[in-house]
Curated annotation (Swiss-Prot):
This is Partitioning defective 6 homolog gamma. Adapter protein involved in asymmetrical cell division and cell polarization processes. May play a role in the formation of epithelial tight junctions. The PARD6-PARD3 complex links GTP-bound Rho small GTPases to atypical protein kinase C proteins. Residues 1-115 are annotated as: Interaction with PRKCI and PRKCZ. SUPFAM superfamilies: CAD & PB1 domains, PDZ domain-like. It comes from Mus musculus (Mouse). One of its GO terms (cellular component) is plasma membrane. The lineage of its organism: Eukaryota, Metazoa, Chordata, Craniata, Vertebrata. It is found in: Cytoplasm; Cell membrane; Cell junction, Tight junction. The gene is Pard6g.
Amino acid sequence: MNRSFHKSQTLRFYDCSAVEVKSKFGAEFRRFSLDRHKPGKFEDFYQLVVHTHHISNTEVTIGYADVHGDLLPINNDDNFCKAVSSANPLLRVFIQKREEADHYSFGAGTLSRKKKVLVTLRDDGLRRRPHLNISMPHDFRPVSSIIDVDILPETHRRVRLYRHGYEKPLGFYIRDGTSVRVTPHGLEKVPGIFISRMVPGGLAESTGLLAVNDEVLEVNGIEVAGKTLDQVTDMMIANSHNLIVTVKPANQRNNVVRSSRTSGSSVHSTDSTTSHHSLPGAHVLQNSEDVESDEEADIVIEGALEPQHIPKTQAVPPGSLSRANGTSLAHGLHRRDMSLHSSGRESNGSIHRFLSSLKPDPRHSLVLPQGGVEEHGPAITL
């Protein structure tokens, strides 16, 4: 091996115009230097290489490794000057016999395909490239999100738009118009701000959460009621990097249906309260048991009449009772009569007010089967 390595190292540090050349032919390495600004011609470089390796009588091909690790040929003045100018800081030259040379080995990515050449070109630090993970991306940047779903009404929607610092516009236009509000005095028309147009391919259209004719209610927590169109526009521009818009969608069918804790319970409680105070027999008569229906009928009748008529209900012949509703009716009437005397004194006033509406014809409130108590029951007897 040539011992001029230390000399070339000195040239590299003290002479910035010198380019160190490391040539390889087979298992031999040679080192020499060239002038970066005046490298000369390719013929002179060719003669220098073959003279340095003592192969003057052999036809060879010369190639070099560029900064990207690709093996490129040196066969004219242009690519020779390019090779010298791109050397940083070392120009690696490879020499092969022409009959043994593979001309298809030159080109981009050739050194990465030839393992033996790669080992000779690079040291350990450059040879071990990190493996490129070409797969589905793991870190997605959010474009939009729906927030405050729990605290907003179902007819409203709060959308957050993310721009991530790039110059892509928000992608929608707004206009002023007239909206209808429910006030204590009725429906009133008030000024409102609406989305007039969506820019195709814009940020707002790509989210799918905003649409034309959606009414803008708030911008970053500030209500737009009472503000002009220019003021709302300035508010959106000032908060465009993190815009939070509360809208009332024009198409309410796309809203998320949530289970309301107040609406569902209030409906059920109202229904149950009304059923107890309006018509006690209405809910019971929908069932298939006639005994409960007759018991409820006794409550209505006995609450409106005098107590001395109650024993007549018990004096009905057992045959007629069994023919109407069975033998269990007598026991049900007896239990209901005992509970009526205790509860009638407490709610006597409310029962009388309710029964006043049923006095004209109690048959209409009692849906009884044909051939039942209608003939022998207490409703006809009393």
